[in-house]
Amino acid sequence: MSFLKKWKTNWDLKSLTFDQLFDVIVTVVTKQLDELEKDEVTLEANLVIDFEADSVDVVAMLLYLEDMFKNASETTRTVVPTDKLGQIVLVEDILDIMYEVLLEIESKMDPFVKIKPDFDALEKQKKMGELYSNN
């Protein structure tokens, strides 16, 4: 199973532009990998080699994204797939997953309803590594 990357040739998402979705991804990556600056995150960046992320970081990023789009995903009973976790290498892989999830959500929603990321939900989340600390 590989990533489709349909968004590279045809952007079908109506609720968010490429730049808006990429900004959401960058915000999530820099929240989990807090030593990074937003301008360091590119589509081609390798999460493990360039940013020293591990599998817990990747899972955390997907959980943050799921939380940011929770209202729409719960309404449509759409979930972020976990079957591709082991294949996520690049930042664009995360974007690809979310693009496909958001397309699925849009296909199940009223066409006049826009999906909006909830940045407040992200702010309320603790960093994954802090969940089990005593701080």
Show where each model-derived region lies.
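Phosphopantetheine-dependent thiolation modules in NRPS/PKS and related acyl-activating systems
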Residues: 2-53, 57-63, 67, 71-135
